[in-house]
Amino acid sequence: MIKIFSFSNGKLKEIDPTTLKKERRTSYWIDLFCSNIEEIKSIREIFDIHPAAEEDILSNQTRTKYEEFEENTAVIMQGIKEIEEFNIKIYNLSFIFGENYLITSHFENNEAIDSLISNPKKLENLMKKGAGHIFHYLLDKEIDKCMQIKSILLEEFKQTEKEFIKNPEKEVLEDLFQKELTLLETRQVMESLTDLCLSLTRPTDNYLDNELLPYFRDIYDHSFRTTESLKSMLGRING
């Protein structure tokens, strides 16, 4: 499914994908949800998507990465959807941004994207500033979600740790061990996201406005502190 929004002359519009034509003075946000090769083909041709980037957004298994191309920049991130029992559910969210457009691609419902689409006023305000501001907004929401998950995990681990001190039974020890593995997996995801966020803090010709750099530095700081918090807890466990 493809949703396309444009902003020009102070007006936000939703466009029929079959009528899409790229215009220089118009900003675009294209959201691809569970899209296939045929759906992406027209978008690829209009926005000069590199074959490597196309391959990445068609896969739900691509690792977190940042890659600059001549016509645009691709950002692929693996986020944490939720944690069930001790299993981390990972999902991919892909971004491709160019001079006046942002393309998002995902295979699962995304709360931040759905919320933005259902809030035309918010979307209009972001697109008025430029498509890069939508990218910043969505990335910020993803890191916020990771911070919330980290806080929940650390609190659960502390509670299990206290329980083990009071009742050092095998079952509690196994629970503690499983939670440690979950923390380790979460840290690995966060380390990749932190490296990604760091890439966005450096001035380059990557089609992002330099005025956004301070905001990306804030996101990096939040991601870094989340990663360090997980490292600290794991260090205490193993130390």
Write out the residue ranges for each language-model feature.
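Helix-boundary and N-terminal cytosolic regulatory elements
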Residues: M1-K129, S192, L196-L208
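Long, non-coiled-coil amphipathic alpha-helical linker/lever segments
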Residues: E124-E142, C146, L208-Y215, I219
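Membrane-associated alpha-helical segments
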Residues: N100, E142, S151-I152, K158-G239
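Short flexible/disordered coil segments
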Residues: I90-L93, S118-Y137, I165-P168, T227-R236
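A short, ordered amphipathic alpha-helix with a cationic face
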Residues: W29-I30, N125, I149-S151, R187
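A short, structure-level motif marking secondary-structure boundaries and short turns
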Residues: R24-T26, I134, E171-V172
